[in-house]
Curated annotation (Swiss-Prot):
Its main location: mitochondrion. It comes from the Eukaryota. Acts as a mitochondrial iron-sulfur (Fe-S) cluster assembly factor that facilitates (Fe-S) cluster insertion into a subset of mitochondrial proteins. Probably acts together with the monothiol glutaredoxin GLRX5. May protect cells against oxidative stress. One of its GO terms (biological process) is iron-sulfur cluster assembly. InterPro entries: BolA, BolA-like_sf, BolA/IbaG_stress_morph_reg. Interacts with GLRX5. The lineage of its organism: Eukaryota, Metazoa, Chordata, Craniata, Vertebrata. This is BolA-like protein 1. It is found in: Mitochondrion. Belongs to the BolA/IbaG family. Transmembrane segments: none annotated. The gene is BOLA1. Residues 114-137 are annotated as: Disordered. GO terms for cellular component: iron-sulfur cluster assembly complex; mitochondrion. It comes from Homo sapiens (Human).
Length: 137
C-alpha cells in the first residue's frame, strides 16, 4: 500500500499507471527524475512505473537527485530472471547511472507478479557515506 506522502502524482494513460513522489519529496520533479521516467517508459512500456527519489534521506544537499527506488511492471520481463530484468533497467538508464545517480533500487516485476504483490519495498535508513555499519570495527 502506498502512503499519501509517497504518492503526490498519479497519471493514467492508455492503461498505464505512473506513481511519483517528486524530487526528494518536495512535490517537484527534477530533470534526472524526469529523464529516468521517460527512458523507462520508452524502453519497457511499463504497465506500472513507480519512481521514488530517496535522496532526501541521505547525506546529500537538499534537492539532490542521487538515490532512487523504482518499481517497473512490464510484460517485457516475462520469462526473464531477476538479473536479466535489472540489466534491462540498467541499460535504459546507462547515462544516469554513469553520472548523477549514485544508487538505484529496482523492483522489476511481470504484471502477474504485481497483481500478487503491489507493495513498493522500503529502503533502510542511510548510514552516510563515512559512517560504519553496525558490527564493523
Amino acid at each position: 500500500m502506498l502512503s499519501g506522502r509517497l504518492v503526490l502524482g498519479l497519471v493514467s494513460m492508455a492503461g498505464r499507471v505512473c506513481l511519483c513522489q517528486g524530487s526528494a519529496g518536495s512535490g517537484a520533479i527534477g530533470p534526472v527524475e524526469a529523464a529516468i521516467r521517460t527512458k523507462l517508459e520508452e524502453a519497457l512500456s511499463p504497465e506500472v512505473l513507480e519512481l521514488r527519489n530517496e535522496s532526501g534521506g541521505h547525506a546529500v544537499p537538499p534537492g539532490s537527485e542521487t538515490h532512487f527506488r523504482v518499481a517497473v511492471v512490464s510484460s517485457r520481463f516475462e520469462g526473464l530472471s531477476p538479473l536479466q530484468r535489472h540489466r534491462l533497467v540498467h541499460a535504459a538508464l546507462a547515462e544516469e547511472l554513469g553520472g548523477p545517480v549514485h544508487a538505484l533500487a529496482i523492483q522489476a516485476r511481470t504484471p502477474a507478479q504485481w497483481r500478487e504483490n503491489s507493495q513498493l519495498d522500503t529502503s533502510p535508513p542511510c548510514l552516510g557515506g563515512n559512517k560504519k555499519t553496525l558490527g564493523t570495527p
